[in-house]
Regions:
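Conserved phosphate-interacting/catalytic interface
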Residues: 1-190, 235-587
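Short metal-coordination and nucleic-acid-contact micro-motifs, chiefly zinc-binding Cys/His arrays
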Residues: 190-196
């Protein structure tokens, strides 16, 4: 299903003219042009690099050009056509293995002769003449190369160019005769390959023995990783080798890897959260869908020129099944949409999740998630919404050396949000542990508690207790949380500037075993009330009386269950935020 969807995406891009035909890589980083004359002599080394913005800076980066399809290299010698590194195009490098460099050059020369022999093109003849006359030993000291030799050997890719006698010049990759020759060679490259019915297209075709590499996944090998691979006999069946174990045609392997590499290279289609790299795309290949989706659940709208209010309005409309105009495009809620989560695993890629649904249903799931998360926020918290990463960070000790949340948690949380399913129990466990350890109920933690219990346990009682802001629920654990906040306030008012409050010593016991903590705290509050001015004493005494009146006649509960502790923590958070809001109004 994943490979079929990616292949269909490639074909949609091809139909729209946004990607090269099979046999060509659409975007490959090239740093220099080796410009040749009619006799194959090197005329110039042209720097193709350009300035590109990177954050707040501008850096020099290689130019992305369409080039002939790249071979997948392991440890052997394998040449690429027209575009490669110095080892293959010049026969020299700084790796200290001159014999291997010469072998690379000879392999590259043989490939170009195989493809270009008999081609009636001045550029093709110049390239062949270059390979026939070039002396690899002279490369490091060549007058046109010596000055840039260090840069050329710093993982730079070079491409052939041609200059005619009249001064006109062009890259060999744009020469029609050379392109036709390469296309013919590529189309017949699988003639000797084993044939079988392709699992993706359903057609009999030559099977790809090794699939092209996937690049751009953070944490994977720089040379790329494989989504489909068989690198040990234990993974093979019925005597098959490599790709024959799961027959995918050369065309389909090229199509799906090209599509995935393009998605990974586009920041509007790709986002990394923890160790999971997420790519998403619409069936019609319109970029506005993936751009909007990443803003919906990863944030960053303002950086893309979209206000938070416009983004929220678009999400709400789509969740209700209404089309909206967004980023100069019209978003159809019925458009099929895909979300793929992958993570690195040595030389392979692991699929964390693959989801397919209508864009409107994804929007509805995200809107429901946002509604469940909605809670009174402190004045100092300027965030309109909480991203997936922000939620996962609430489970992490920010004072520890490793501040990254569990990769498993991030993946499970993403899946729950996008599918509308139950939140993972590890999310609640992580937040509960942090509250107990730090005795702090932050906005993020309170929002998680609220969302978790509303989604996983949608009882009428939970709907009554877990609200956006303070409510007058008589639920005992909720009232106890409010009461604890009032007791803390009384202590702070009676002892201005106090370094530690009852929260630091009693929060966990009050939350888990109220009967052991609250009698002591209420007695302590009576002493604090005596220190206050009359207006304050009357005000807080009234608050205490109103809250105590909502408790059962049997007294404080001996213990609270985990859901009841969640209600306690929400009550504490609501009451505390009401106090801060009133304080801000007075100021």
């Amino acid at each position: 299903m994943i490979l079929q969807a990616l292949t269909a995406y490639y074909e949609q891009l091809l139909a729209q003219g946004r990607v090269e035909a099979p046999g060509w890589d659409s975007k490959f980083k090239v740093s220099y042009e080796l410009r040749l004359g009619p006799d194959g002599q090197l005329l110039a080394l042209n720097d193709l690099r350009q300035e590109v913005p990177k954050g707040k800076k501008t850096v020099i980066a290689p130019r992305e050009l369409p080039v002939p399809h790249r071979v997948k290299r392991a440890s052997g010698v394998a040449a690429n056509f027209l575009c490669d590194n110095t080892s293959y195009l010049l026969g020299a490098d700084e790796k200290g293995k001159p014999e291997r460099s010469r072998q690379c050059f000879e392999a590259c020369a043989a490939l170009h002769h195989k493809v270009l022999d008999g081609v009636d093109s001045p550029a093709a003849k110049a390239i062949l003449a270059f390979f026939d006359s070039w002396e690899p030993d002279t490369a490091p000291t060549h007058p046109l190369l010596a000055e840039q030799w260090a840069d050329l050997n710093n993982n730079a890719n070079l491409v052939f160019g041609y200059e005619s006698p009249d001064g006109a010049h062009w890259l060999a990759t744009t020469d029609d005769a050379i392109r036709d020759a390469w296309q013919s060679a590529f189309d017949t490259s699988d003639a000797d390959a084993e044939t079988a019915r392709c699992l993706i297209t359903g057609k009999e075709a030559g099977i790809a023995r090794i699939h092209p590499a996937i690049k751009g996944v953070m944490g994977a090998q720089a040379a790329g990783a494989a989504l489909v691979s068989f690198n040990a006999p234990a993974f093979c069946s019925y005597g098959h080798e490599q790709g024959a174990n799961a027959p995918v045609s050369e065309y389909a392997a090229f199509a799906y890897t090209t599509a995935l590499n393009l998605l990974l290279a586009d920041r509007n289609c790709c986002q990394r959260i923890g160790d999971t790299t997420i790519v998403c795309w619409a069936e019609n290949a319109a970029p506005a869908y993936s751009n909007a989706m990443l803003m919906f659940f990863c944030g960053g709208a303002e950086a893309r020129g979209v206000s938070e209010s416009d983004l929220a309005a678009a999400l709400k409309a789509l969740s209700q099944g209404r089309p909206v105009s967004f980023l100069d495009d019209k978003l159809d809620p019925n458009q099929n949409f895909y979300v793929l989560g992958i993570s690195p695993n040595a030389a392979r890629l692991s699929v964390r999740f693959f989801l397919r649904n209508s864009f409107g249903q994804f929007a509805k799931n995200l809107q429901d998630h946002a509604d469940r998360l909605s809670i009174t926020r402190p004045a100092v918290d300027k965030r309109e919404s909480l991203s997936v990463w922000a939620l996962a960070q609430e489970t992490v000790n920010q004072r520890s050396r490793d501040k990254n949340p569990s990769p498993q948690l991030v993946g499970d949380l993403l899946r729950a949000i996008l599918t509308g399913g139950p939140y993972p129990a590890t999310l609640l466990n992580g937040v509960t542990l942090r509250i107990r350890a730090e005795r702090e109920v932050t906005r993020g933690r309170a929002a998680i508690l609220k969302a978790y219990y509303l989604r996983n346990y949608p009882t009428e009682l939970n709907k009554e207790v877990f609200t956006v802001s303070l409510n007058e629920s008589s639920n005992v654990p909720y009232v106890l949380g409010r009461l604890f906040s009032v007791l803390e306030t009384i202590q702070s008012v009676a002892n201005p500037g106090i370094n530690a409050t009852i929260k630091d010593r009693y929060f966990n016991s009050a939350c888990a075993t109220p009967a052991t903590a609250f009698p002591t705290l209420v007695k302590l509050a009576q002493k604090h009330l005596q220190k206050m001015s009359t207006p304050n004493e009357v005000h807080f005494s009234k608050q205490l009386t109103e809250l105590m009146a909502q408790l059962p006649e049997t007294g404080f509960p001996a213990r609270l269950s985990l859901p009841e502790q969640g209600a306690f923590e929400i009550g504490y958070y609501h009451q505390t935020q009401k106090r801060y809001a009133k304080k801000n109004e007075e100021e």
